[in-house]
Every structure is written in C-alpha cells, then in structure tokens.
C-alpha cells in the first residue's frame, strides 16, 4: 500500500447513494451537538464495518471551499474513531454555519457525537 492511501477513508466506509442516506435518516436515532447532528442506523451483525455520509447544505454554508473543509474534518474524525461505531451507518449533518477558525471545535464535536452514539446504542 502506498503512503498516499494510508490516511484515506476507503470508499467501502462511505455512504454514497441516496437510498443509503434515506435508510439512515428514516431510522430516526439522532444525537446532536451545537453545530452537528448525527443520525445512526444499526446494521446486521454480520456486516460489521462502519460507514458515514456527510450533509453540508449550501443553504447553511454558501462557499464550496468551506463546505469541503468541514467535510474533510468530519471524515478525518470518523476515520480515526470508526472502531467506536462498528456496525453502524452514520450520517453527520451540519446544523448551522461555522467560522473557519472553529475547525478544532467541529472536529471535537464530531468525535464526541461518535462516542456518545457508541455508548448509548
């Protein structure tokens, strides 16, 4: 494996289709923080790896650069802590606009929500 792919999140760990997002959002198990909302759906026991989908609406964050930055931060938090939420499909959604200087807070909120979901489910 080359070093450029060591720190990436595999495509098998991402929700990519609308039906996959819909299934998680319909399940209605939700955890919230100040800026983020985490939707969780437990998966069958034989399907143990965790997957994540991200929603950062244009209505909330107008600039694509900022939307992509937020998604990268959340994806990195998930990559480092995905063992905590094994067997779950997650959709992380931005609730309100954030300042670029709040990167550390967004990262920490994402980690906190993942751990909170793992403890309560």
Curated annotation (Swiss-Prot):
Q: Which reaction does it catalyse?
A: Endonucleolytic cleavage of RNA, removing 5'-extranucleotides from tRNA precursor
**Purpose of the protein:** RNaseP catalyzes the removal of the 5'-leader sequence from pre-tRNA to produce the mature 5'-terminus. It can also cleave other RNA substrates such as 4.5S RNA. The protein component plays an auxiliary but essential role in vivo by binding to the 5'-leader sequence and broadening the substrate specificity of the ribozyme.
* UniProt gene name: rnpA
Tell me which Pfam families the record gives: Ribonuclease_P (PF00825)
Enzyme Commission numbers on file = 3.1.26.5
Superkingdom of the organism of origin: Bacteria
Listed under GO biological process in this entry are: tRNA 5'-leader removal
Similarity comment: Belongs to the RnpA family.
Instruction: Supply the name of the protein.
Output: Ribonuclease P protein component
What EC class does the entry list? hydrolase
A cellular component term from Gene Ontology for this protein is:
ribonuclease P complex
Q: Does the keyword Hydrolase apply?
A: yes
Q: Which UniProt keywords apply?
A: Endonuclease, Hydrolase, Nuclease, RNA-binding, tRNA processing
Q: Name one GO molecular function term.
A: 3'-tRNA processing endoribonuclease activity
The record's subunit annotation is:
Consists of a catalytic RNA component (M1 or rnpB) and a protein subunit.
Cited HAMAP family: RNase_P
Task: Please tell me whether the keyword tRNA processing is annotated for this protein.
Answer: yes
């Amino acid at each position: 494996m080359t070093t450029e792919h060591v720190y990436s999140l595999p495509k098998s760990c991402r929700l990519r289709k609308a039906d996959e997002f819909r299934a998680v959002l319909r399940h209605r198990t939700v955890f919230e923080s100040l800026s983020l909302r985490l939707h969780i759906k437990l998966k069958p026991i034989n399907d143990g790896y965790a997957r994540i989908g991200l929603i950062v609406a244009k209505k909330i964050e107008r600039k694509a650069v900022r939307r992509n930055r937020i998604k990268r931060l959340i994806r990195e938090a998930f990559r480092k802590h995905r063992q905590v939420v094994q067997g779950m499909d997650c959709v992380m959604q931005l609730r309100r606009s954030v300042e670029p200087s709040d990167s550390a807070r967004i990262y920490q909120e994402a980690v906190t929500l993942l751990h909170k979901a793992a403890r309560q489910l």
